[in-house]
UniProtKB/Swiss-Prot annotation:
It is found in: Secreted. Keywords: Acetylcholine receptor inhibiting toxin, Disulfide bond, Ion channel impairing toxin, Neurotoxin, Postsynaptic neurotoxin, Secreted, Signal, Toxin. This is Weak toxin 1. GO terms for molecular function: acetylcholine receptor inhibitor activity; ion channel regulator activity; toxin activity. It comes from Bungarus candidus (Malayan krait). The keyword Secreted applies. The keyword Zinc does not apply.
Length: 86
């Protein structure tokens, strides 16, 4: 009986998704507080700065599977801890 119970506990632990889910900020404002839970495959928080037609720099934040390459007139910052893309 103890063996059966132990087996059931092990199976339950293996079947549960015990993985860590990253959270990143997702708003463009400088003092962004809007948090988004990333999908399981998204392990990177991204913050992109880009020049918006002489209106100054804008930021775009979110989750990503990998760190994207910067486009012309753009700066990309990537990190991998919760809400690190401030």
């Amino acid at each position: 009986m103890k063996t059966l119970l132990l087996t059931l506990v092990v199976v339950a632990i293996v079947c549960l998704d015990l993985g860590y889910t990253l959270t990143c900020l997702i708003c463009p404002e400088k003092d962004c507080q809007k948090v988004h839970t990333c999908r399981n495959e998204e392990k990177i928080c991204v913050k992109r700065f880009y020049d918006k037609n002489q209106l100054g720099w804008r930021a775009q934040r979110g989750c990503a599977v990998s760190c994207p390459k910067a486009k012309p007139n753009e700066t990309v910052q990537c990190c991998s801890t919760d809400k690190c893309n401030k």
